[in-house]
A protein has these predicted regions:
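Alpha-helical transmembrane segments of multi-pass membrane proteins
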Residues: 2-6, 63, 67-74, 78
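Interfacial helix-loop-helix junctions of multi-pass membrane proteins
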Residues: 11-22, 71-72, 76-159
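Membrane-interfacial alpha-helical segments at the cytosolic side of multi-pass membrane proteins
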Residues: 28-45, 83-89, 154-167
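Canonical alpha-helical transmembrane segment with a positive-inside/aromatic-interface signature
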Residues: 43-60
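Hydrophobic alpha-helical transmembrane segments
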Residues: 61-64, 150
Length: 170
């Protein structure tokens, strides 16, 4: 996963060349991490020196939780790299609609919705205006993070279900 993400994705530009590279990696990561979590619990279940006899359902839950924890830790890593080293591991997303309470004129919690965003203009410290010409609002990572966690979830659920069926029928 790290080789595919960092070497192929970042250095060889697979994230740009293949639009769904990131989605595929995070889905696969969810699946594989659930497999690792499941295998670890299964090894403990089968070990005669350890008095552990977990049900297939509980094994599937542990595998799912293991996978999601690894996914969250990876997103923490991406966020840290972006903040500390000014990288762009949490890929930007172009949005045409945003919803924010920061623009509520009453400074309350009413979400103000802005639709049809076509461009963002940056105003630099010296007053220089720089239109980005991106065709929308530049979201700097939250949409990517949530998509990554969602597809990790899908991969984890799929493997956990397979693992449950495997142990239940063995």
């Amino acid at each position: 996963f790290i080789f595919a993400a960092e070497i192929l994705g970042e250095i060889q530009s697979f994230y740009i060349t293949f639009p769904y590279w990131d989605t595929m990696l995070h889905t696969l990561n969810g699946f594989l991490c659930a497999a690792i979590g499941f295998a670890l619990v299964d090894l403990l279940n089968r070990n005669e020196r350890v008095s552990l006899n977990l049900s297939p359902f509980f094994m599937a839950v542990v595998a799912f939780c293991f996978s999601m924890t690894i996914g969250v830790l990876w997103e923490f890593f991406e966020f840290s790299m972006d903040q500390i080293f000014l990288m762009d591991m949490q890929k930007d997303t172009i949005l045409n609609t945003i919803s924010t309470v920061n623009l509520d004129p009453d400074h309350g919690t009413k979400a103000i919705i802005i639709r049809g965003i076509q461009d963002v203009i940056l105003v630099l410290e010296d007053g220089t205006q720089m239109p980005l010409g991106l065709g929308g609002y530049l979201d700097v990572g939250i949409a990517d993070t949530m998509k990554d966690l969602f597809v990790n979830f899908i991969g984890a659920v799929v493997f956990s279900a397979i693992g449950f069926i495997y142990v239940k029928t063995r």
